[in-house]
């Protein structure tokens, strides 16, 4: 579900990272969690491939004792608290992509990876992903792990029965605009009563925003969530509701999963990691699915980084470990282990990722996700985006689920955004 407790917590604590980390003095002596030859790595369940972690421990055993620790619960809060407490700080820390903007303003608490030679690896990674790990002052805080290119998942037989294009290349070519996508949804509903093209309006709104180069706050700390790029995404979501191509179901609920299984929800816009969600959530649909390009251009949803904290006593060795763990073959293994889509284009052609997928009717989904990952637009991510984007996501959901008047919902969203902006010191 989109409005999980975790998601709400993130929205409410938008400025926490900046406040907590900002309390540390630059260059202070910070006790580390590692002692002697130990090197501590923090990450979360599914944040790294288990095979890659295991192999890294074995590979560097002669120089360090790599202690890779999976941190449960609210990872960001625990990392921030530990760093602010100046004790037991990990040498290497995973940083979730959705939280990255909160860490970048405090770049002085991390080792600048460029000073360790990061630039020589730059051309091996997606440009837009590489840029996301760099702070405004030029410090490279995060080394790329994965990304989440968004594509169009659909059920082959249902589309065929509805008289829609059903081969991946045809779906990509013929549903390449939002208008054509919506028209397909209307045809689907007409030919197969009770069916919907997508689960909810938030899928349309959020993906439309994520297709562009701007979000909710710009580099000058100015609120831009009332500008044309957001208004356009809002209008598309409202149109999807008005044209009745979205369901009244909530994503992730038993009713929604049943509708997917029954072919009543035969389509969704999802990131590469949604392949795993489908396989575990609706295993009986094996073989029914295919993947095509999403309308207009790809968006990104997800992806994380590895960092080296200032507490690290052996940053050069930590960097060697990071760069090895994140090379193309290991990123491919991370995809096999945990569905982490590689940020290294060289991975896309490796045999490991090129096996036909029976769940997707034998399709090689890398033919879609690989090119999509390379076409994503670089966007500025502000530490205030989460807080100032949430009212818009909440209100468009009210339009979709509760039938709230779109104009009233927009007005209410803007009022909430102004109050939050005032509190955070964001101009509008």
Residue spans for each PLM region:
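Short helix-initiation/N-cap motifs at beta->coil->alpha
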Residues: 69-79, 98, 174-180, 248-262
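Glycine-centered hinge/linker elements that transmit conformational signals in sensory
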Residues: 182-186, 220-250
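Paired acidic/hydrophobic, glycine-rich loop segments that form the ligand-binding mouth/hinge
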Residues: 91-94, 266-271
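Extracytoplasmic/periplasmic substrate-recognition and gating elements
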Residues: 58, 84, 242-243, 281-342, ...
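Short, solvent-exposed loop/beta-turn-alpha elements that line the ligand-binding surface or hinge
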Residues: 114-125, 169-174, 214-233, 280-284, ...
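C-terminal capping/gating helix-and-loop segments adjacent to ligand/active sites or protein-protein/ligand interfaces
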Residues: 250, 363-416
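Conserved N-terminal structural module of periplasmic/extracytoplasmic solute-binding proteins
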Residues: 1-102, 119-121, 296, 313-317, ...
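Hinge/lid segment of periplasmic solute-binding proteins
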Residues: 96-151, 290
């Amino acid at each position: 579900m989109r409005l999980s407790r975790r998601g709400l917590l993130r929205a409410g604590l938008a400025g926490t990272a900046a406040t907590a980390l900002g309390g540390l003095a630059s260059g202070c002596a910070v006790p580390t969690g590692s002692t002697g030859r130990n090197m501590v790595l923090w990450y979360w369940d599914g944040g790294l491939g288990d095979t890659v972690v295991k192999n890294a421990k074995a590979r560097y055993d002669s120089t360090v004792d790599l202690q890779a620790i999976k941190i449960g619960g609210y990872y960001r809060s625990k990392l921030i608290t530990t760093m602010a407490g100046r004790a037991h700080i990990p040498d290497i820390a995973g940083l979730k992509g959705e939280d990255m903007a909160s860490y970048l303003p405090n770049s002085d608490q991390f080792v600048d990876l460029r000073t360790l030679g990061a630039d020589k690896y730059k051309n091996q990674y997606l440009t837009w992903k590489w840029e996301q790990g760099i702070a405004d002052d030029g410090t490279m805080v995060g080394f790329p792990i994965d990304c989440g290119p968004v594509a169009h998942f659909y059920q082959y037989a249902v589309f065929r029965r509805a008289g829609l294009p059903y081969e991946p290349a045809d779906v990509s070519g013929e549903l390449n605009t939002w208008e054509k996508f919506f028209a397909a949804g209307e045809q689907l509903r007409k030919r197969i009563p009770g069916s919907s093209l997508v689960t909810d309006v938030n899928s349309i709104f959020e993906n439309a925003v994520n297709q562009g180069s701007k979000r909710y706050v710009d580099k000058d700390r100015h609120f831009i969530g009332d500008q044309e790029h957001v208004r356009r995404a809002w209008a598309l979501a409202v149109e999807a509701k008005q044209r009745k191509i979205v369901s009244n179901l909530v994503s992730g609920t038993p009713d929604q999963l049943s509708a997917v299984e029954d072919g009543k929800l035969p389509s969704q816009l999802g990131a590469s990691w949604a392949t795993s969600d489908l396989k575990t959530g609706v295993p009986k649909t094996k073989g029914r699915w295919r993947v095509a390009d999403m309308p207009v251009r790809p968006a990104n949803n997800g992806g994380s980084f590895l960092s080296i904290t200032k507490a690290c006593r052996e940053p050069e060795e930590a960097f060697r470990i990071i760069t090895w763990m994140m090379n193309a073959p290991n990123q491919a293994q991370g995809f096999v282990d945990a569905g982490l889509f590689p940020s290294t284009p060289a991975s896309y052609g490796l045999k490991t990722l090129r096996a036909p997928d029976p769940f997707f009717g034998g399709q090689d989904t890398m033919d879609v996700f690989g090119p999509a990952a390379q076409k994503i637009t670089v966007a500025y991510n502000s530490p205030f985006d989460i807080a100032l984007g949430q009212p818009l996501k909440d209100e468009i959901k009210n339009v979709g689920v509760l039938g709230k008047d779109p104009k009233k919902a927009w007005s209410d969203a803007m009022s909430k955004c102004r109050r939050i902006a005032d509190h955070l010191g964001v101009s509008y």
